[in-house]
Curated annotation (Swiss-Prot):
The name this protein goes by in its record: Protein adenylyltransferase FICD
Glycan-bearing residues: 272
Residues the record lists as O-AMP-serine modifications: 76
Family: Belongs to the fic family.
TPR repeats: 103-136, 137-170
Cellular compartments annotated: Endoplasmic reticulum membrane
Organism of this sequence: Cricetulus griseus (Chinese hamster)
Residues with the O-AMP-threonine modification: 77, 180
A GO cellular-component term linked to this record: endoplasmic reticulum membrane
Amino acid sequence: MPMASVIAVAEPKWISVWGRFLWLTLLSMALGSLLALLLPLGAVEEQCLAVLRSFHLLRSKLDRTQHVVTKCTSPSTELSVTSGDVGLLTVKTKTSPAGKLEAKAALNQALEMKRQGKREKAHKLFLHALKMDPGFVDALNEFGIFSEEEKDIIQADYLYTRALTISPFHEKALVNRDRTLPLVEEIDQRYFSIIDSKVKKVMSIPKGSSALRRVMEETYYHHIYHTVAIEGNTLTLSEIRHILETRYAVPGKSLEEQNEVIGMHAAMKYINTTLVSRIGSVTIDDMLEIHRRVLGYVDPVEAGRFRRTQVLVGHHIPPHPRDVEKQMQEFTQWLNSEDAMNLHPVEFAALAHYKLVYIHPFIDGNGRTSRLLMNLILMQAGYPPITILKEQRSEYYHVLEVANEGDVRPFIRFIAKCTEVTLDTLLLATTEYSVALPEAQPNHSGLKETLPVRP
């Protein structure tokens, strides 16, 4: 056979063998890559959590202009106010280099204006520095000193605490905080004493008082209205009263929203008739029973059950589902501990609310359940249940966020303020020339009876 023919015949065989070898090599590499991907599957949950946290951080950066802030004393600043002139700062976003430079320049100008005695200008410049860079520790400390000089001890202490949250070993802030902390604790205790005196006045109102009975009835409807409105429910006060009195639906309104009202009513009835006067510890089962009623008319599958999925709540990542039950057990132990019982009732109730909503044990209804637990603690201590108004929603969420960042005292003060407002309302409504709460109109004109809301 000619050589050319041999080569012509052998070449395809050589190409075929080489092709198979190449494919086997590629297949081995692919299998190796697949094996490398499969090996870490045992830790897939931790990886998912890391991804969630990364996504959460990215979202917070993208949304840095959409942070919820409460009303300010000055429209030119993003510092929110809870009581007095306490500014609440959030440092969830990374400040740009240009922002840091502007903040430093503003701080230097503020100190110069302060030295010259131009305190109003200095105040605005301090605010501007912190607006540009909320995590500027030196500005926080210097503004704290300025606030002390203005006799605003609570704001000064908050600013020092904020600085130490960011930089725990900042020497000047440590010294300043050591000076203001006992003063602030005294101020808080004095405020609790004022609340206690008002509680005694409310307790002295005759139980048969028709005015007290009337205002308590209206307060009941108002509480349901505001607590569901905070979560986005659009029903009016009159519509809520119609639903609870007739058990008939309001036409044109979401049945889910109406069932939220029925659930809140059922949960409040359960607390009032079963838990308030009961002697003994508050248990996990008690909280599950409250939640079962809160959510039972909207989502009976999830009602009274701990969540089984990871959730994100604003900037807060609650505990992993596998840790929820353990954390709830620890929370319940604290709830019934001597340390908790020795707290002022308002402080105890506020901390219980915060701790439960921090764990976020349920897929939905955590806020409503936390507010009900808070009121259960207050009522067991002889206080009336309090209402957080829907108009306070931004402030309410903001002080919760500040608590997540390490300072729960603004949230406690917020709850104390709500408690005092509730007490003042009861006292005002039971005086001779009282102005009671605006009543929900009993004549439901235009509200036709339709299919009953699920009982």
